[in-house]
Amino acid sequence: DEPPQTPWDRVKDLVTVYVE
């Protein structure tokens, strides 16, 4: 089951891009 898209997912994506 896939968890619902949450704002935190977006934040994690942004953080990942920023960190790299």
UniProtKB/Swiss-Prot annotation:
Protein name: Apolipoprotein A-I
GO MF entry, a single one: protein homodimerization activity
Main location: secreted
Region spans: Disordered: 1-20
Cell compartments where the protein resides: Secreted
Cellular component aspect of the GO annotation: high-density lipoprotein particle
Lineage: Eukaryota, Metazoa, Chordata, Craniata, Vertebrata
Function according to Swiss-Prot or TrEMBL: Participates in the reverse transport of cholesterol from tissues to the liver for excretion by promoting cholesterol efflux from tissues and by acting as a cofactor for the lecithin cholesterol acyltransferase (LCAT). As part of the SPAP complex, activates spermatozoa motility.
Domain of life, per lineage: Eukaryota
Originating species: Erythrocebus patas (Red guenon)
Keywords: Cholesterol metabolism, HDL, Lipid metabolism, Lipid transport, Oxidation, Secreted, Steroid metabolism, Sterol metabolism, Transport
Subunit structure: Homodimer. Interacts with APOA1BP and CLU. Component of a sperm activating protein complex (SPAP), consisting of APOA1, an immunoglobulin heavy chain, an immunoglobulin light chain and albumin. Interacts with NDRG1. Interacts with SCGB3A2. Interacts with NAXE and YJEFN3.
Tissue occurrence: Major protein of plasma HDL, also found in chylomicrons.
Family: Belongs to the apolipoprotein A1/A4/E family.
GO BP annotations listed: cholesterol metabolic process; lipid transport; positive regulation of cholesterol efflux; positive regulation of phagocytosis; positive regulation of phospholipid efflux; protein stabilization
